[in-house]
Amino acid sequence: MKICLIDETGAGDGALSVLASRWGLEHDEDNLMALVLTPEHLELRKRDEPKLGGIFVDFVGGTMAHRRKFGGGRGEAVAKAVGIKGDYLPDVVDATAGLGRDAFVLASVGCRVRMLERNPVVAALLDDGLARGYADAEIGGWLQERLQLIHASSLTALTDITPRPQVVYLDPMFPHKQKSALVKKEMRVFQSLVGPDLDADGLLEPARLLATKRVVVKRPDYAPPLANVATPNAVVTKGHRFDIYAGTPV
């Protein structure tokens, strides 16, 4: 995959070249999307909109730390949707990991989560965030136990993941209604990189065959159900709903 690669560390140790070969990235000087290695982290920038800033994965500080400490925990909609109750903490495959936010919330309340991400740039960002998270004194221990990354396409990986999870979680990209600043800067940068999930409808059936209990699909409230398969079961929040489908028991 072609992207502009920029090293701002000043270290001159070739770390960016190692990273590029690991994730199959090729430097393209004219690409509007840039993957930048800074002294702190790896980040994604949209070069024609510098005001948007860089996007990076941070499980240790910022909004994720706040959500972990002061968020709803088990009361969060995603936790309710996957079926967390009492001692039941399902094993989850997050088949559309993105920046790992929902996966992190589930891991922080005790679920084991395997994240699937097919885009190599997003996978590199996730891997960088995980490495910093794993090394953190406060969260590193449980994060290593509960949150892992698999760089693979969900369309193929969903058929051969073992052991089977109890829950498969899907949050495919859906075109935004607004073109304004209401669309978070992050989503704008993200959609420039990966585009809409045109094959997302193809994920529902393999997800239902893989999950032993349920499949949870996060949708904007205005979006039709995935693959146009309606379900009466959903956890509804302001702006989103989590559609719940039966899996395939062992």
Swiss-Prot record:
Organism: Escherichia fergusonii (strain ATCC 35469 / DSM 13698 / CCUG 18766 / IAM 14443 / JCM 21226 / LMG 7866 / NBRC 102419 / NCTC 12128 / CDC 0568-73)
NCBIfam families hit by this protein: PRK10742.1
Pfam families in the record: SAM_MT (PF04445)
Enzyme Commission identifier(s): 2.1.1.242
Top-rank EC class of the record's enzyme: transferase
GO MF: rRNA (guanine-N2-)-methyltransferase activity
Database matches in SUPFAM superfamilies: S-adenosyl-L-methionine-dependent methyltransferases
Protein name per UniProt: Ribosomal RNA small subunit methyltransferase J
Matches recorded under Gene3D superfamilies: Vaccinia Virus protein VP39, YhiQ-like domain
UniProt superkingdom: Bacteria
Taxonomic lineage from the root: Bacteria, Pseudomonadati, Pseudomonadota, Gammaproteobacteria, Enterobacterales
Record bears the keyword S-adenosyl-L-methionine: yes
List of residues binding S-adenosyl-L-methionine: R101, D102, E117, R118, S153, S154, D171
Family: Belongs to the methyltransferase superfamily. RsmJ family.
Record PANTHER family: RIBOSOMAL RNA SMALL SUBUNIT METHYLTRANSFERASE J
Compartments reported by the entry: Cytoplasm
